[in-house]
Amino acid sequence: MWNSLKAFALVFGGCCSNVITFETLMSNETGSINNLITFCQFLFVTCQGLPEFLDVHQPFPYFKPLKTPLHVYVITVVLFYISSTTNNNVFKYNISIPIHIVFRCFGTVITMFTCWLLNGRKYTKIQILSTLFLTIGAIIASLFKDADFRYQDLKLQAWKIGSDQSVDLTFIFGICILVLSSFTSSLLSAYNERTYQKYGKHWKENIFYSHFLSLPLFLFSRKQLIHEYRVMRKSERILCSNFGGKILVPREETLLLFNVLTQYFCVKGVNILASKTNALTLSITLLVRKFISLLLSVRLFDNNLSYTGYIGVYLVFFGAFIYSLGSIHPRQNDKGAIKKSK
C-alpha cells in the first residue's frame, strides 16, 4: 500500500514538475535543446543506478547477474528510446502543445487495444466506458482550452481546410512522429506488463537497463547534441543567492538540472506503478496527471481555461472516478490472462 502511494506521489509530483521545467526550456530564445534534454535524463538515471547494479568488490568490476533476460531488455530499449526521442523532438515540426496532448490522450485507447491484442487481457464495460470518457474529455479540454466551442467556428475551420491548396509537409511529418510515439509508448506499457508477469516485478532493474542500454544510440545524434550544448551555453545568466552572497548561474543549465531531477522521480514513480498495477491503470493515471499539469499551467502562467475546456476536465476526472469504481471488484479475466501469457 505504501509503495503504491509513493508511486502516485512520484508520478504526480515528479512528472508535473518535469512538464513545467520542460515547457520553460521549450520557450527559450536560444533554440531547441530537445535531444540534449533527453540525453541528460538518460545519463542521470544511469549514473544514479550504476552503484546498485555494478559489483566493485572484485578485482575487475562487473555487472550483477540479471533477473530478467537481456534479450527482453533489448526490445524494451528499442521501444523506450523511440518513444522518448520522438516525444521530445516532435515540437520541431510545427506541433503545438494542444495537438501534442490530444494525440497523447489516445494512448489510453491504444494501450487498451495492445494489451487485448498482445496479452489477451479482457476489460469490463465500465473500464471501456471510462476510457472513452477520459479520451473525449482530454480532446475537448485540449482543443478548446482558450475558447469555447462554437459551431460557426467549426464550419469556418472546415472551409479553410477544404479551400487551402497548400500542404504543410512539416506538420504532416510531425503528426506521423506523434502517431509513432503514441504506439511505441503503448507497446512498451503492454510489453512491460507481460515482462513483470513472467519474470517478476524488478522495476529498478528495468529502469537502469532501459536507460543504460539506450545511451549508445545517442551516438547517431552526437553532432546535434554538441550543437545543442553550445546553444545552451549561450543562455543568459540569472542571479541566485547562496551562503556567501549572490552568484550568476546559467539559466538554461539550471532549468536542465531541475528537469533531469524531476524526470528521475517521474520515471521511478511510473515504473513502481507499472509493477503494482496493469498497463491500462498506468495509462489512465498518466492521463489524469497530464490534466493536473494542464490545470497547473492555467494557474501558474495565468492562462485562461474556457467553459468548454472545464467540461473536458470534468469528463476526465469523471472517467477516472468510474474506472476506479470498476477496478474495485476482483478481475477474474486478469488472472486468466496471466496464465495465458505464461
UniProtKB/Swiss-Prot annotation:
Topology, Cytoplasmic side: 1-6, 57-61, 118-123, 190-253, 329-342
Xref: InterPro entries: SCL35B1-4/HUT1 (IPR013657)
Subcellular locations according to the entry: Endoplasmic reticulum; Endoplasmic reticulum membrane
Keyword DNA-binding: no
Entry GO terms, CC: endoplasmic reticulum; endoplasmic reticulum membrane; Golgi membrane
GO molecular function: UDP-N-acetylglucosamine transmembrane transporter activity; UDP-xylose transmembrane transporter activity
Domain of life: Eukaryota
Chain ranges on the Lumenal side, renumbered to this chain: 28-35, 83-96, 145-168, 275-307
Keyword annotations from UniProtKB, A to Z: Endoplasmic reticulum, Membrane, Sugar transport, Transmembrane, Transmembrane helix, Transport
Membrane association type: Multi-pass membrane protein
TM helices/strands, residue ranges: 7-27, 36-56, 62-82, 97-117, 124-144, 169-189, 254-274, 308-328
Transport in keyword set: yes
GO biological process terms on file: chitin biosynthetic process; transmembrane transport; UDP-glucose transmembrane transport; UDP-N-acetylglucosamine transmembrane transport
One Pfam assignment: UAA
Family of this protein: Belongs to the nucleotide-sugar transporter family. SLC35B subfamily.
Function in brief: Sugar transporter that specifically mediates the transport of UDP-N-acetylglucosamine (UDP-GlcNAc) and is required for cell wall chitin synthesis.
The protein, known as: UDP-N-acetylglucosamine transporter YEA4
Organism: Saccharomyces cerevisiae (strain ATCC 204508 / S288c)
